[in-house]
Each structure stands twice: as structure tokens, then as C-alpha cells.
């Protein structure tokens, strides 16, 4: 009980009522949470059919799907632990970055870009907990565009063409955004029977409405569904939020996996893949300062992410021979592991405006907490994100190359901490913080969606606990930088629209020492080079076509696959979380088919939406298709489900290798 509260409430009926209310809200905070999967108690040297390294977005989905097969035994290892409560409440997403559940990766300083960032390096937040980055991202549901997957298919085969990947997006999706559900033309591209909820909001923030109006004035059409293929403009994203809480492959799939043949080890750091005679046979891992070995009878699968997957491959002898030999690592397979690193390049533009511009939905914090505890509504339950997609030219009006992401920041906001988390340097954050004491800030993230620049990931040393070296390579191709004068000027033009003009909005050009005394376009290029950072969507370091094949098998190594964002040969035009789930879903079916196991869950070949079946699904790469010709109603997906009996699987401890192993993993 709060000090002095008893005497304040009194002893009568009113006091009893208020006391009960206080106790109710104190108790309901305990209901904000999740019962996460428990650690297993395993014999050192235990054997499994499949060992999956990394319980992030991909690993959680893949482990859950493989565990649907009764005679598959699966071990899932995660370097982190359980997500904190902040990972569940949407509004607290930013507090997880630069925390103990973040790998806190950074790029290597190159003295060419990012001079306006702290230490001249780009921040690369990645989730180090169950759910991985799916437990700390912004929950934006984006898929990319059909042309992205036509590129993939040309490199890795027709498994990855748009028509096929769309079926897998729909398989996992449970769309509840009423703006989409009530529109048959939109719903033809969405699922209603999947595990992960994709929701909208009927209470769009005031500032978001004003941004949409501003973009409409600037010539953008308003798009009701930001995943709709071949249609670009400005609009609000749907989000993976269920009943006011973050949804993800962890919560929707792994948490609901009931198989006794799925074992999970948390706080377990995998240090090496064991490869013998060209075959991956297991992994080496450290838990509680002890080293353990586990063996895979069928496959080792890496789902450790764009930075840790190449690190593990290289530590295990799979990588560029010159780099491995320079560290004294025996080369098992000479592959361009770590190459092809690329990301959406992001530069911030700034406006200031009169107080009252944002009209924040953030009511007094305690009231928002009460609303959230009571019925999971209010500001804490939201993740309002919007964007405006821009084509490169009018000749390709349905394929975006750039995006603008605006945010309105009320006066006296705790902007400084977020600024530093983003990675801007102290001087710049202080300048913006001081402006926010007088004005409201508008930030517009200008993002290049299809960069040509490439970087790389290399080993720092042979110590597996050392972070990899991340050479971002941003603007290594000057052509990428050349786009930003146009893009930043488009962001600035928001100040000239009716509402923002009425609020005296004006452009702020932050002081960047290297960029003084330049013309406007030259200043923008200089500033962009100095301020550019990652949009936290890095991909490509174990790419299909060069490191893995179209079935995600590592070239030249038996029994080893990669299933995560690192396999993307080219980045998609949008946030990468939903595509990573899709990759895991496809991988699960590829593995089941390889071992002659029937697929489980939604029968994709019989998937029906309205009277549109998977076999008759239109080629969406043709923007002139008349969807009205193929849609007559908005029936829900008719899923053919295959029931699978889950049986206990005996975990066998090897005897021939037991001399190497003395301990048992004892987990509470």
C-alpha cells in the first residue's frame, strides 16, 4: 500500500471502493506479461533431428513448424533470455534498444560517412532474447513489392517468386485491420486464419492525419493498405499487435507449440558448428561458463541473423578463404560469407513548428497506464507508423525506391535520450533538445529502399564472444547519395503545406562542421553523408545464389541451412520482419518435403479466398489486372488442416563422444 493511502481513503464505503480500485490496478500489472517457454534439462551430447541456432523471428517460427511433425526432434538455442514486459507493451518499444536485451552491434568507423553520429558509427540494434528483433522492433507489417521477389526468383528459383511467397505471407497472417477486412479488393491479398495478428487502429493520431493531408497536398494518393502490390502513395501501416500487445512468431507460434519433442535452451551461446567430412553434425555452445556439445542427425539450421549467422559460419571454416586463413582458421568451404551486406540508408530531416502542432495523444502518464491496465487501450497500446512511398521516376509509378517516415514530437519531450539511442552525436542531440524546449519538432526519416552500396561482415578475432566487424558500406556507391537532395527537399516541402504553414513550420539545418559554406544541394549531400545511418534492416550476408541455394542449403556442406534475413539476395522495399517469417514458413515446408513429410497447417494448394484459389491467383506483377473480375465476395480462407499426432521422442545421449562431455545442462 502506498504510504499514507489508507488514512486518505477512509474507512467508509467510498474508502473501501477506492481501495479496491487501487488494489485492482496494482494487481492487473501482473497480467501484463506472458508465460514464456521454459528451459529444458538436457544431457550433454544429446542428439536431435534438427538443431536451430537462434530463437528470433525466423527460429521461433521454424522450430514451431518443425515440431508439428511427430517424429521430428528439435533443439532450439537462444543466446538471450525471456523478453521483459516492455517487449509486450507497444509504446515501450524504444526503451529496449541499447539495453541488456539488445546485441548493441555497431558499424566500424570509416571516416567517410556518419561523422555526425556518435563516434562516427551506425547503431545496429538487434534483439538478444526470445523472439529476437521481433521482440523489439516497431511491429510494422510490410512485405515489400512483387518486383522484389521477381529479383529473388531470378537468382534462387521460382520458390521465391511473388505468387508463391504471397501464399506464405497469407498462411501466417490473421488480418483484423477493419480498413482492409471490409474491402474485398484488398482482402484478396490477406489471410484470416493465420497465427500472427495484423491489426489496425480506428483512432489514428492527430499528427498522422495531418501528415496524410500534407502528403495529399504534395501529390501523393492516400493508400488504405500499405502492403497492396503495385500501388504506392502515403498511408498508415498495419501492425503485429493483438489486443494491445505485441504479437510475433514467438508469441503466436513458438509459445503455442505443444510438442514434447521440441526442447529450448535459453542463455546459451553457440560458438561453433561442428563440421566433419563436409557435413554439419552438431554445434558447440557455452552455458553458465561450461561448454556443451549437441548433435544433429539431420540438419543444423542457422537463424542467428544478418550479423551472427555469418560470424558462426566463418568461425566454423565456412567463408572467404583469404579472410579465414588470415585468422588461422582452416577453410572448410570457400564461400563469400559476410559479403553483400546492405541496408536501407536513412537520413533525418528536421522542421520546427509552433506548440500545439502535434496535439499529442499522450495524456498524463498515469491515466494512460490505467487505461492500458484496464482494457489494453490508449497510447500505450499503439504503434502508429506511416510512410509515403516515392518512385524513382514517373515511368515506374508502382515501384517505390524511396520512403519518407514523418514523426511529430511535442514540446518538452524526452527527445534527447531517443536521439542518442538513434546514434546522433552529443552536439547534434543537444541542439535538437534545446529547440524542443521552445518548439515542437517534426522529424522526417528519408530512406533509400533499394541501395546499390554494399558492405561486409568479418570476424574480429577467433574469439566467438567478440562481436563481428560490420563494415556498413553506406554510400560506397555515389549514386545512392545522389538521390538525397531530391528526397530531403521533398521532406522539407511538408512545411509548405496548409496545416504546417499555419503552424509556422520551418526547416532546421543542423550544424555539421564539414558542411558549412555550401550551396543548398551540396549542403544536403554533405549533410546526408555525415548523418546517414541504418534503418535497422540489414540483409544479405549469407545470400541465396552465392552462399546458400534456393532451398537455403549452404553450398558445399551437407546438413547445414540458413533461415533468416541473411539469405535475402537483395533487400525488399519495406520492413523485413514479415518477410523473415515468410522465409521461415517456406523453409519449414522445404524441410518437410525433403524428408517426405506432409505439410501441416494451411494447405496452400487448396487455399481459397472468395472464389480466388492459389492455382488461379493473378500475376500481380501486371498492374493493370482488374481484381473485380476475380473477386465477388470476401470469404475467409478455407484451410485444409492435416492433424498430426505429437508423440514423445526419446533424447539419446551419445556414448562414442561421451568422453568429451562431463556435464549436464541443469536448468531451472
Swiss-Prot record:
EC number of the protein: 1.1.3.16
UniProt entry keywords in alphabetical sequence: FAD, Flavoprotein, Oxidoreductase
Reactions the enzyme catalyzes: ecdysone + O2 = 3-dehydroecdysone + H2O2
Active site: 537
InterPro entries: FAD/NAD-bd_sf (IPR036188), GMC_OxRdtase (IPR012132), GMC_OxRdtase_N (IPR000172), GMC_OxRtase_C (IPR007867)
Entry annotated with the keyword Nucleus: no
Organism of provenance: Bombyx mori (Silk moth)
GO terms of molecular function: flavin adenine dinucleotide binding; oxidoreductase activity, acting on CH-OH group of donors
Enzyme class, UniProt record, top EC level: oxidoreductase
Gene3D superfamilies listed in its UniProt record: FAD/NAD(P)-binding domain, Glucose Oxidase, domain 3
Disrupted gene: phenotype observed: Causes large body size and prolongs the final instar larval stage. In the midgut of instar larval stage (L5D4), causes an increase of ecdysteroid levels, up-regulation of IRS and PI3K mRNA levels and down-regulation of TSC1 and TSC2 mRNA levels. RNAi-mediated knockdown at the pupal stage, does not affect growth or ovary development. However, the ovary has decreased levels of 3-dehydroecdysone without affecting ecdysone levels. Also, hatching rate is reduced and, laid eggs have lower levels of 20-hydroxyecdysone and are arrested at the organogenesis stage.
Binding site for FAD: 137-140, 270, 536-537
Domain of life: Eukaryota
The protein's name in its UniProt record: Ecdysone oxidase
The keyword Protein biosynthesis belongs to this UniProt entry's keyword annotation: no
Family that this chain belongs to: Belongs to the GMC oxidoreductase family.
PANTHER family noted in UniProt: CHOLINE DEHYDROGENASE, MITOCHONDRIAL, GLUCOSE-METHANOL-CHOLINE GMC OXIDOREDUCTASE
Function: Involved in the inactivation of ecdysteroid molting hormones by converting ecdysteroids into 3-dehydroecdysteroids.
Cofactors, names only: FAD
